[in-house]
Design a protein with these regions (language model features):
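Short beta-strand-to-loop capping motifs
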Residues: 37-41
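Short, non-transmembrane amphipathic alpha-helical segments
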Residues: 10-14, 45-65
């Protein structure tokens, strides 16, 4: 799996866990990216549950470092890009 497929998979998992999530992706290299998720605080645990195991698997089995960072949309507004 490449970084683009990993990002697509994780963003789909996030969207399923929280329909209200605003997602911002920053690709740093062919093996590294960060996904910032701005969602209601009550969705944080569901998002983490949907992504945590997969991000660890990507790191240990695929060598891909994709960080998923969850922010409360009520206190942290997402950037435009």
């Amino acid at each position: 799996m490449g970084i683009d497929e990993a990002i697509t998979d994780l963003t789909a998992r996030i969207s399923t866990a929280s329909l209200e999530a605003v997602i911002r992706v920053k690709r740093r290299s062919d093996e590294e990216a960060s996904i910032r998720v701005y969602a209601p605080v009550e969705h944080e645990e569901a998002i983490k549950a949907a992504t945590q195991e997969q991000t660890l698997r990507l790191l240990t089995e695929e060598g891909l470092d994709v960080q998923v960072l969850v922010y409360d949309i009520a206190t942290s507004l997402p950037p435009e890009q």
